[in-house]
Amino acid sequence: TVQVSIGGYTKTVKLNITDSAESIKFTSSQGSVAIPLDEKSVTTAKYSAAVINGEGADLGRNVTLEIYDRNNVNKYTLPEGISFDASKGIVSVTSAAVPCVFTVRATGESSDGKTLSRSVKVTVHGLSFDFGSGEDESVTEGYTDVNPSTTYTEQRGYGIEGSVKSEGTPSIDNATSDYLSGDFTFKAKVTKGKLYKVKVAFSGDLVSEYVSEALSGHERTLEAEGTTHTGYTVKTAEITEQIYDIPVVDDVLDLKFTGAKVAYITIEKVEKTAAEKPNIWSVGDSTIGNNGSYAYNLARDQANYPELTALADYHNNGKGSRNLKTYYTQGWLDNILINIRPGDIVTIGNMGTNPGGMSGTQFKAPLDYYVDACLAMGAKVILTSYTPHGCVEGYEYVYDKTTHTFHGCREDAYDSLGIRVIYEERKDNPDILGFIDIGLNADNAFNEYVADYAKNGYTDENAAAQAIIDCFGDHNHYGNAGRSQLAGDLMLNGYGTTPGIVSELVRVLTESANRPCVKIEAEYDDNGTLVNLTTTPAKVSEAQKAERSKNSLITYWYSFENMRPVISE
């Protein structure tokens, strides 16, 4: 018995403790189910419930599951592309589905025969989102509602983080009539390592794919046209639809808005297939990007290197004055990630000339991300040291006139605490194809060239060395501003017993292609039971994408010890 007194009046209520202690509890449920992007895929969610007592123990009673409308009032017929198996409690969603909201209601009986029920609201969402008040009849058809209370959670799979308010006039016919304003981040779970075409109707500032304080996201809006960034739009005062290509390295696409009004976002996955021949993309600063640098010359003159072009096409992606931070925030790494096709190669190593405020071990985390990002997008990675110091004012030590030898190979924190450490940590990963020591090889090639001074037309070793020294306008740059191409040519082609960059690329690619792997053929009966397994030695160059049918699966793996697929899905 409970006695309640309010304003001088007393009411006595008798409660049945046994009845109230029994209830229904969902033992498995999901509040959000994503519409798959792939026509062959099906997204499922499991729902189950039990009648429990006051101590939470399952009483073992029957519970039925039914589908009701979003308000949990009337039974609801699921639209095309969505089905519910009540006996198994499975909601299945195909790519034919459209966004909708419904309720899964669980019903059972208490010990005295009274009806017990509990419900969970389920949002089936695609990747088209209408931002606004969330009022009934305000969400544009085919879009999923995002309102001030739609906070991002792992379970929901989409939503916002930050402070927002709803503004504008809600309309079911116009997705831009209302919007959310403020400083906030929108997140949506997507498939890891894929490229997405994202349409955003907004005003204000936008940054995509925040990683860390150092890699604070690709800046997508500028006040005016400029050449510092790529993949951006000019900031507008009015809500305007903009389109961006966004590579997503992890499984969450994030868009950070500042001083913004956001009306809608649509996200579409872009499928990419392997090129007829792999591409080599090169991450770097001006030491590879500028006129006269080895990467600039190799990309321009690669027809002169048929042994390399038979294996891959080379691209110079160096950008002057960039560091690990700005190469990312200004979109240049994204530009590579966008263009990567399965089986492409990325070289990473010439990005330490401009420290960008980093020192010591601080280089390693951004470099690790660069590697992880390229691998996630389907590329293989070759790590390199970077080009040598020139023997100019302040760097006279680079050439020793007594021993007639160069020592320009850099040994700073970027190199010794960054790129070389990463290679040692990852060298057993088959997707890290190798390490090319550009700086050390340059020293050795220069030294052999100097030792061969007479053959090369010089009076003595120092004269030959001076010809190399004269290629450098400063300690970083060589072969530019009309200077001799000798230093760059020696780096590219090597000299004597020292290999050049071209032959090293050929070596690494050839060794990778000839690496052994295992072809695994599995046979299944109609019930999915494995009935036969065959393994055959193969080479990486022979590997194909997984071939599936109802009764068979053919895949290629590096080895049984290293169960990594040669070609990722």
What positions do the PLM features span?
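Extracellular/luminal low-complexity segments enriched in Ser/Thr/Pro
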Residues: 1, 89-99
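Short, solvent-exposed loop/turn segments at the edges of extracellular beta-sandwich modules
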Residues: 7-9, 109-114
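C-terminal edge beta-strand
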Residues: 11-18, 116-125
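Proline-enriched interdomain boundary motifs that mark the N-terminal boundary
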Residues: 22-30
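Low-complexity "stalk/linker" and mucin-like segments enriched in Ser/Thr/Pro/Ala/Gly
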Residues: 26, 35, 57, 68-88
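Alpha-helical cap/lid subdomain in secreted, periplasmic
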Residues: 48, 332-484, 489-493
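Compositionally biased, intrinsically disordered or flexible polar/acidic segments
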Residues: 126-292
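Serine-esterase "nucleophile elbow" of acetyl-processing enzymes
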Residues: 131, 255, 268-319, 333-346
